[in-house]
Amino acid sequence: MINPRRSTAAVLVSLLALAGCTSTSDSAATGASAAAPTSTGPVTVTSCQRTIALDAPPQRIFAVFHPAIELAHALGAGDRLVGTAFLDNQILPEYAAAQATVPYNDDYPSKERLYSLTPDFVLSAFNDAFTPDVLGSQNDLAAQNINSYVFGEWCPAAEPGEGKPLQLKKATFETTYTDITQVGVLLGAPDRAADIIARMKAVVDDTRTRVRGADTSVTVAVGTLRDDGTISVQGGSGITQEIIEIAGGTNAYADIATRQASVSVEDFVRRDPDVIVLAPCCGKDMTVADGQKEVDKYTAAPALADVTAVRDKRFIVVPFPGLFSGIRNADTAAQIARALHPDRF
């Protein structure tokens, strides 16, 4: 819900453009969170250089991180979730009731807690979950007869299964579509997966059509101003890069090869972005309304006063999960496009 106390016109424009964030997502909506698998035979997929073979859809799923949790619900597996961890923001409204019945952890559960839930499958949106000191590597889990899948955006570059924090590959919307397809196959919901992808592609196509011919030279920085004075920005290898391109903008940090990087205030001033995208995080009750705190940090920083986006108060606040591979990506691109090019919508 938009905070009525917000008075900065540019912020209000941005948030009004994103008003759909708290309602049912057209590209993600697929009906109820629980649905019987439509495919029940043996399946095999390959992800992150790892082959995953299942004789039947998993019945006891533990989902880690927001994009994985929402994907499980979107695929109709909400009633098969035995536990979840790490929601970044409020879950999409259509899955709220189902999620409320699922055990939830704000942090990683201990291995003992995980094993006590007797999962037969762990679905994670980030590779960090599969490290020996967290949930265990994918090989560790396999030794306990627990299959697992990590989203392709966060595949380790080598040594599949060991969960080591290695350099990651470039992610695109095709990476997201592949994950949705493969997880849909594994969970026995290939038709629902295809429907999600079709809806996302329709939103992307509509957005591209609307911004075609618009001025795409506007520079956009996805950045979080930290308490230590540095700024965490999104580089050119994550899904954010294509989100900005689809929205009709130019990533101010596209030349940075990594997904995220810490930059100095001086570098941020030198790049002088026209628009700053903010994504408040992290907690299961957070919404775009919490973005006002991030806006206030920028506008209160004297060293950033002359940055075009700060001076003109051009901030776009989006839900954090939309900036990482998952079912919200298409809507996030459309929401940013509406704020960058309101005359096209």
Residue ranges and their predicted role:
Residues R60, V64-F130, A252, T287:
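A short, structured surface patch at a secondary-structure boundary
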Residues K170-D179, A194, D255-I256, V275-F345:
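Structured C-terminal subdomain patch of bacterial secreted/periplasmic proteins
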Residues K111-S124, V265-C281:
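Proline-aspartate-enriched helix->loop->beta-strand connector
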Residues L87-I91, Q99-A100, V233-Q260, F320:
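Alpha-helical, coiled-coil/dimerization segments enriched in small aliphatic residues
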Residues S47-Q49, V102-E112, P132, I256-V265:
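Short helix-initiation/N-cap motifs at beta->coil->alpha
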Residues I2-I69, V185-G223, P342-F345:
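Bacterial Sec-exported substrate-binding components of ABC uptake systems
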Residues D128-G136, I146-Q182, D215-I239:
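Extracytoplasmic ligand-binding site segments that recognize negatively charged/polar headgroups
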Residues P67-E70, L87-Q90, F121-V122, N127-T131, ...:
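Solvent-exposed loop/turn segments at secondary-structure junctions
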